[in-house]
UniProtKB/Swiss-Prot annotation:
PANTHER family, per database record: ETHYLENE-RESPONSIVE PROTEINASE INHIBITOR 1, PROTEIN, PUTATIVE, EXPRESSED-RELATED
Location(s) in or outside the cell: Secreted
Primary localisation category: secreted
Induction details: By tobacco mosaic virus infection, wounding, UV light, salicylic acid and ethylene.
Disulfide bonds: none
Assigned protein family: Belongs to the protease inhibitor I13 (potato type I serine protease inhibitor) family.
Propeptide residue interval(s): 23-36
Protein name: Proteinase inhibitor I-A
Source organism phylogeny: Eukaryota, Viridiplantae, Streptophyta, Embryophyta, Tracheophyta
Amino acid sequence: MVKFAHVVAFLLLASLIQPLTARDLEINVLQLDVSQSGCPGVTKERWPELLGTPAKFAMQIIQKENPKLTNVQTILNGGPVTEDLRCNRVRLFVNVLDFIVQTPQIG
């Protein structure tokens, strides 16, 4: 009798879990809009086309497209960074082979 009660309890719990995982939670991700954050004269804020490229090549492209960016940093992916916003800085997150692994953006 105890085993039957466990089976029934398991089936009831399993029927509750499936609808919880299948529903859309409608979570909106907030994006920082650089143009509204006080960065005047910014012509381009993100470079998704540079994913997978060598860091030196990406650095040249970014500085050519926006000369106001005087601080282009190469950082190993997962390394510590500050959370402050700087309009003249772009961080290039690279892997051990020095290829871009995250979309470079102003910040």
